[in-house]
Amino acid sequence: MKKIAEAWPIVKGDYTVGNPESRIAVVTLASQINSLPEAALWGSSKTENLGVEKIIINTISNSNIRYILICGKESRGHLAGHSLLAIHANGIDEKGRIVGSEGAIPFIENISREAVKRFQQQVVLLDRIGLTNLEEIMKIVREYKDQGEVYPEEPLVAISQKKRQSTFTIPHSGDIIVSEEFVMDSAAGVVCTTNDF
């Protein structure tokens, strides 16, 4: 069985790659804490939406990761750590809102409910929000880095291919005069020369 997706980690972020075979990843929230090579991934997450999405995507694309240590100081207003705990415990509603999150904008837009469910099943979250002592963090990483079995399913690559669609509207009227040479079609939001009409 394949354990790690090709080109893992799938999405870029503010993290360091350590041992991809490790059972633990470390999220330092808004704190910058020196990384240990024993963790699969080690990095910060300051937002309750894109930051949480990146953690989920990079976790479920490596079946070796079974624990996530959440440590460091919370980011004010965004509450990325609280939101990570909430999505793990409660998931998302039909609008993509993280159920139970108190973050400013707790909406997940780029991954599916299936990806969230896989995340909930694959990992155990170790809630040590506020912990910044490197020795204590090292002790936890060393305790969990080899603990447990690989998740019994192949990695899940859950990245949205959703691209912003550009829209082009042909102007129909020059209903706002900008100057003698230019008019604007307010419905299309396009500025044209008066010769175009």
From Swiss-Prot:
List GO BP terms, alphabetically: methylation
Print the keywords alphabetically.
Answer: Methyltransferase, Transferase
Q: Which InterPro entries match?
A: MeTrfase_MtrA/MtxA
Q: Which domain of life is it from?
A: Archaea
Recorded GO terms, molecular function?
A: methyltransferase activity
Subunit structure, as described in the record: May be part of a complex composed of 3 subunits; MtxA, MtxH and MtxX.
- State the family named in the UniProt similarity comment for this chain: Belongs to the MtrA family.
Q: What is this protein called?
A: Putative methyltransferase Mtx subunit A
Q: Which gene encodes it?
A: mtxA
